[in-house]
């Protein structure tokens, strides 16, 4: 029997199909970015939760303690970290919510922010009651009560400032201003989480778990609830909201 090599046209079509499939998969990911974020965050959160429930000491927590508590703490830095931490306290969040309600375009943005915050807090308290992880001991620079996982400050920061990011992305027309505001809000979110580790009231896994759970909640909220609450003609949509 004589060997017949495959035709070039077959290879060409196979490669063409692979490229087409790759492009289709890429478009699918781009069209469902929030879903991808939710899946990744859910995976990370469940992985951390499994370790917490098993009462295992995570290398993540040990590394964060070494880096932030043992090597980063300085007398001049502590007041700065306390200030960032205070941005997610009830009084500060209420003041910020009032300001957003007063100055945001449309009449329903404040309602949306309030509903989001209340539900995120309820989710946080429910998870804390289920997991009941004790807070770290022996190196606190601030008073804190209640359970540790997931971090309430981290969840509030991501829920409140993260929803602000969503609003800015949808309704701010100036691209430079939009980018600057979003970067500033993301820095605030990150610094609030870091400050909780620095002050010794949370493990790093508490903070990352709080961020992940809150991001999953935000994906659900912005896809299902927020569009219903913000269906206000007074809010003018930008091209970003139609893409």
Q: Model regions: which residues?
A:
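The feature marks cytosolic C-terminal regulatory regions of anion transporters and related permeases
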Residues: 105-142
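Short helix-capping/hinge motifs at transmembrane helix termini and TM-loop junctions
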Residues: 53-55, 104, 131-132, 173, ...
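Membrane-embedded catalytic cores of phosphoryl/pyrophosphoryl-handling enzymes
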Residues: 5, 15-18, 97, 140-243
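Membrane-helix interface segments
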Residues: 76, 106-110, 136, 174-180
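Interfacial segments of alpha-helical transmembrane regions
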Residues: 32, 36-40, 97-120
């Amino acid at each position: 029997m004589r060997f017949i090599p495959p035709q070039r046209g077959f290879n060409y079509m196979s490669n063409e199909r692979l490229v087409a499939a790759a492009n289709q998969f890429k478009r699918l990911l781009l069209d469902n970015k929030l879903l991808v974020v939710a899946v990744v965050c859910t995976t990370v959160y469940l992985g951390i939760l499994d370790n917490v429930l098993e009462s295992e000491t995570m290398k993540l927590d040990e590394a964060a303690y070494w880096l932030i508590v043992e090597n980063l703490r300085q007398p001049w830095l502590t007041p700065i970290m306390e200030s960032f931490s205070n941005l997610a306290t009830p009084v500060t969040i209420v003041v910020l919510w009032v300001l957003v309600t007063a100055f945001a375009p449309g009449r329903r943005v404040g309602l949306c922010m309030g509903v989001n915050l209340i539900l995120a807090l309820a989710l946080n308290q429910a998870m804390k009651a289920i997991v009941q992880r004790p807070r770290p001991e022996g190196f606190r620079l601030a008073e804190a009560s209640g359970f540790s996982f997931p971090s309430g400050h981290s969840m509030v920061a991501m829920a409140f400032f993260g929803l602000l990011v969503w609003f800015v992305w949808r309704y701010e027309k100036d691209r430079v201003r939009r980018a600057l505001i979003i970067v500033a809000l993301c820095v605030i979110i990150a610094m609030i989480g870091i400050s909780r580790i620095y002050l010794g009231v949370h493990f790093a896994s508490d903070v990352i778990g709080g961020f992940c759970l809150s991001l999953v909640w935000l994906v659900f909220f912005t896809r299902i609830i927020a569009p219903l609450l913000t269906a206000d003609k007074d809010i003018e949509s930008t091209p970003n909201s139609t893409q």
